[in-house]
Amino acid sequence: MLVPTVIEQTARGERAYDIYSRLLKDRIIMLSGDVNDQMANSIIAQLLFLDAQDNTKDIYMYINSPGGVITSGMAIVDTMNFIKSPVSTIATGMAASMASIILAEGEKGKRFALPHATVLIHQPLGGAQGQATEIQIAAEEILKTRKMINEILAKDSGQDIETIKRDTERDHYMTAQEAKDYGLIDDIMVNQNK
């Protein structure tokens, strides 16, 4: 992937940044693509860095992701909740599956979506093979994970657990307005200058 470079003029001359480093200076983190261990480590490092710099200022996390590995996503969520800096989440494009959990776990009152963003919630996906005992262990683990995800969604949205169970039984797509009405985000971001 080609990463754009930004040139900044300073008193000491020009300085070139990759676009993500330049955004990080403004406390902006881009969570885009599949959620996996590598991405989670990068996002967590950025969260910790920004929190260490100034834990009184907001961090802005822009999310455009189809979701991914639950343990990786939960590591991001746990870090968001561990640091002192408020984390504002903004869905751009798609916040699906694990990415919808990260979106909903943003600071209350600071969870947003752009007007044409899509949010998708569903039950965890998984599979198992091997001996019957191993399959049973895997099935029990995915049921525990489903319960945890449903409880997080209920807490963040204000929906009762039965509604969450019903709505995550299959893929449940939402527009930005539907996600706001559901309680997963607080508002829809629009350009105030237009």
Curated annotation (Swiss-Prot):
It is found in: Cytoplasm. It catalyses: Hydrolysis of proteins to small peptides in the presence of ATP and magnesium. alpha-casein is the usual test substrate. In the absence of ATP, only oligopeptides shorter than five residues are hydrolyzed (such as succinyl-Leu-Tyr-|-NHMec, and Leu-Tyr-Leu-|-Tyr-Trp, in which cleavage of the -Tyr-|-Leu- and -Tyr-|-Trp bonds also occurs). One of its GO terms (cellular component) is endopeptidase Clp complex. Keywords: Cytoplasm, Hydrolase, Protease, Serine protease. Signal peptide: none annotated. The active site is at S97, H122. Coiled coil: none annotated. It holds the Pfam family CLP_protease. It is an enzyme of class 3 (hydrolase). Cleaves peptides in various proteins in a process that requires ATP hydrolysis. Has a chymotrypsin-like activity. Plays a major role in the degradation of misfolded proteins. Fourteen ClpP subunits assemble into 2 heptameric rings which stack back to back to give a disk-like structure with a central cavity, resembling the structure of eukaryotic proteasomes. PANTHER family: ATP-DEPENDENT CLP PROTEASE PROTEOLYTIC SUBUNIT (PTHR10381:SF70). HAMAP family: ClpP. This is ATP-dependent Clp protease proteolytic subunit. The gene is clpP.
